[in-house]
From Swiss-Prot:
Encoding gene (name): rpsS
Source taxon at top rank: Bacteria
Keyword rRNA-binding carried by entry: yes
Region spans: Disordered: 76-95
NCBIfam families, sorted: rpsS_bact
Function: Protein S19 forms a complex with S13 that binds strongly to the 16S ribosomal RNA.
GO molecular function, one term: structural constituent of ribosome
Protein family (similarity comment): Belongs to the universal ribosomal protein uS19 family.
Residues in the signal sequence: none
Protein name: Small ribosomal subunit protein uS19
PANTHER family per the UniProt record, alphabetical: RIBOSOMAL PROTEIN S19P FAMILY MEMBER, SMALL RIBOSOMAL SUBUNIT PROTEIN US19M
GO cellular component, one term: small ribosomal subunit
Biological-process GO terms, alphabetical: ribosomal small subunit assembly; translation
Length: 95
């Protein structure tokens, strides 16, 4: 279910404060955050935000296409080990 328009998008207040300070000073520093649930707002465009994936921080460069999405969408939490080889899967089978 989508968040109510009346409430507006959720953005971690500390993260928003850091982004606004960087916008005022004109700096381009990497901002670390654990707030994967924060919605990307237009103020964040052009910044790099290091989003925590449970193990480490993944740097995510924010573009205009990302506005409205959540930060956590761009930092995967699971490692894909690959599919099993066909040889390994059929090796133990008796025919």
């Amino acid at each position: 279910m989508a968040r109510s328009r009346k409430k507006g998008p959720y953005v971690d207040p500390k993260l928003l404060k850091k982004i606004r300070m960087l916008n005022e000073s004109g700096e381009k520093k990497i901002v670390k955050t654990w707030s994967r649930a924060s919605t990307i707002v237009p103020e964040m465009v052009g910044h790099t935000i290091a989003v925590h994936n449970g193990l480490k921080h993944i740097p995510v460069y924010i573009t205009e296409n990302m506005v409205g999405h959540r930060l956590g969408e761009f930092a995967p939490t699971r490692r894909f080990g690959g599919h099993a080889d066909k040889k390994a899967a059929t090796k133990g089978q008796v025919r």
